[in-house]
């Protein structure tokens, strides 16, 4: 499974986003990545659908995101593609530790 993770510089985003409500940028990103087979896992972490997303589609999704949103490139401070071998939910361990 592939994932895209990123950080946005909030000051830069506030200056470059096309309206005053720059937090809407996260919704724009979500919509763009969903169109390429990704779903939001948490925060700025998106997992690709195993049956649709490979390394090339990660690159194409990010290129499309940057091309269609002129505020994205100047605002993104870090963005990475990750290959995830296992996706294990650790919440049972957390709950067991405090019970």
Tell where the protein language model's regions lie, with residue ranges:
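Basic nucleic-acid-binding interfaces
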Residues: 2-3, 11-99
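Active-site flanking residues adjacent to catalytic metal/cofactor-binding acidic residues
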Residues: 6
